[in-house]
Amino acid sequence: MPVIRTSVFIRAEPEVCFDMARSIDIHMESTSQTNEIAVGGRRSGLIELGETVTWEATHFGVRQRLTAKITAFDRPHRFVDEMVSGAFRRFEHEHRFVKENEGTRMEDTFDYSSPWGPLGRLADQLFLYRYMERLLLKRNQYIKDCAE
């Protein structure tokens, strides 16, 4: 099961970073390259504990849907979203926000399993891990740019 970890320093308070990371609107802006839109559940504003959002996006030329639920929430320190349905076998995405010097260290841990058994593991090694890592890094940079 691959685990992607990212970390970025943002010159903003943890509360600002936390709210930007859970903003449906900022998520859609940051993923415009995949035409990602919220089509179900919470569709705008700040997602809360227990809420779901259904995303529709184009990855690898295929329009897909994925529903995630917020399963842990400790503002402004941490929240977790987990896949309810979608293309992965499963995923858990933990977002952490640590006060550091004149800002916040924003850390992501994206723990996932691909479908299709051995073929999914091969896809992870060949391209999926790097693809997902780039999506997370781009999103984090977008949040950083907006917050600063």
What function would you assign to each model-found segment?
Residues M1-S44, E48:
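Hydrophobic ligand-binding cavity/cleft-lining segments
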Residues M1-V3, R78, H93-H95, L136-N140:
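Secondary-structure boundary/capping motif
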Residues E13, R75-P76, E100-G103:
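Short strand-connecting beta-turns/loops that link adjacent beta-strands
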